[in-house]
């Protein structure tokens, strides 16, 4: 089993249906701005993530440009998560699609 790639617009639509979007960018970038409703997934927050998501939950992985999200998506599949997606274009693609973001500015 592997993950699928989806567009930012598809990710947003899936989030409206209950999918979990995890943002794997660094702490400073995530704190500054991130997709609205995203969970910040780090090594330190993984246990909290495991409490939030079950193995059948749709999980969308977002990074900077859509490259490193593939590695994390593969890792999640290897951990037993069955419904994993990597977001094409990452947060840059999300912003280009003019989808909602949470910011600190």
Swiss-Prot record:
Give the family from UniProt: Belongs to the GlpE family.
Where in or outside the cell it occurs: the entry states: Cytoplasm
Q: Where is the active site?
A: 63 (cysteine persulfide intermediate)
Q: Which reaction does it catalyse?
A: thiosulfate + hydrogen cyanide = thiocyanate + sulfite + 2 H(+); thiosulfate + [thioredoxin]-dithiol = [thioredoxin]-disulfide + hydrogen sulfide + sulfite + 2 H(+)
What name does the UniProt record give this protein?
Thiosulfate sulfurtransferase GlpE
What's one GO MF term for it?
thiosulfate-cyanide sulfurtransferase activity
Q: Which gene encodes it?
A: glpE
- Presence of the UniProt keyword Cytoplasm in the record: yes
EC number of the protein: 2.8.1.1
Q: Could you name the Gene Ontology cellular component terms for this entry?
A: cytoplasm
Q: Does the keyword Cytoplasm apply?
A: yes
Return the Pfam families for the record. Rhodanese
The record's listing under SMART domains reads: RHOD
Q: Which GO terms describe its biological process?
A: glycerol metabolic process
What InterPro entries does its record include? GlpE_sulfurtransferase, Rhodanese-like_dom, Rhodanese-like_dom_sf, Thiosulf_sulfurTrfase
Q: Which organism is it from?
A: Haemophilus influenzae (strain PittGG)
Which NCBIfam families does the record match to this protein? Answer: PRK00162.1
